[in-house]
Structure formats: structure tokens, C-alpha cells
Amino acid sequence: MYHHQQKIRKHWHRTVLFFSVALLIAWNFAVILHQVDLTPEHHTHHHCQLFSGVQHGIAKAQPTLSTPTFTRIQYHDVFQRLVNSEDIRGAARAPPYFA
């Protein structure tokens, strides 16, 4: 029974694969024939992607970029703050600081 089910499943996989490939090839030929444009009057009845993409893809005006501002609100020098800090911390074995 199991062998019979495996045969049926393999048959369905092959059938689905065959029809998928056939549909893909037919779709590719349809797209190629549409882009070759053998009959230009075909495009006068509808707005297809081939022509509307060109019309909508053209930029009417170029975008303008604003100049960036590089001003800091407040300048903090981390190194100077560490060197000039009054808070002196001792090591773990240092004598206590009584000042």
C-alpha cells in the first residue's frame, strides 16, 4: 500500500512540475510577443505597462537637497574632562582619602 501511495505522489509531483514549466514557457512567449509590438494599434485600446511605465517614470523636476548644518549645540571634550576632573578615586587597596 505504501509503495502505491509513493507512486501516486511521484506522479502528481511530475504532473505539477510539467504544467508549471509549460505555463512558464507560454507566459515568456506571451511577454516577448507583447514587447516586440507587432501590432501597435493593440496599445491604443489600453494603457499597458510598456507605455505607462515610460510616461510615469520620467521625473518632472529634480529633487533639491538642502545643505546640512554641522553646528553643535554644546562642545564636550571627554579627554579634557577626564584629565581635569577633581574627583579622584583610589584603587581598591589604597589608603582612605580624608581631604
Swiss-Prot record:
This is Uncharacterized 11.6 kDa protein in scrR 3'region. It comes from the Bacteria. InterPro entries: DUF2607 (IPR019731). It comes from Vibrio alginolyticus. It holds the Pfam family DUF2607.
